[in-house]
Amino acid sequence: GPLQRGAMVGGLDEAMAAVVRDRAGIGVEVVVTDLHTAFLRPAHGPVAASARVTGGGRVLCFCEAEARDAAGQVVATAMGTYRIRPKATVGEAACT
């Protein structure tokens, strides 16, 4: 059957977060603040996600991603906004 949509969203989110982490460097954590996904067609079999940074600065980063099936057809797209912040240290509240 087709790939479950939640798995597709998770893959697109992780692809975008990875490019933000690569850009931001070590010592930071990346948190999604806004995510929009469009499902274009059912995905059967393996799916590959790719992402790129489209803008932003030191605190917020904007990204786009797409998922393609084994035939190279785009099956889903996403846009996300990610917050970049210093990693919490031991004893620091996680919800700040």
Question: Which ranges hold each PLM region?
Answer:
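HotDog/MaoC-like acyl-thioester-processing domains
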Residues: 42-46, 54-96
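Short, function-defining helix-loop hinge/capping sites that tune catalysis or transport
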Residues: 12, 21-22, 72
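Residue-level detector of alpha-helix boundary/anchor positions
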Residues: 4, 25-27, 70
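Flexible, active-site-adjacent loop/turn segments at secondary-structure boundaries
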Residues: 1, 38, 58
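Hot-dog-fold acyl-thioester-processing enzymes
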Residues: 1-17
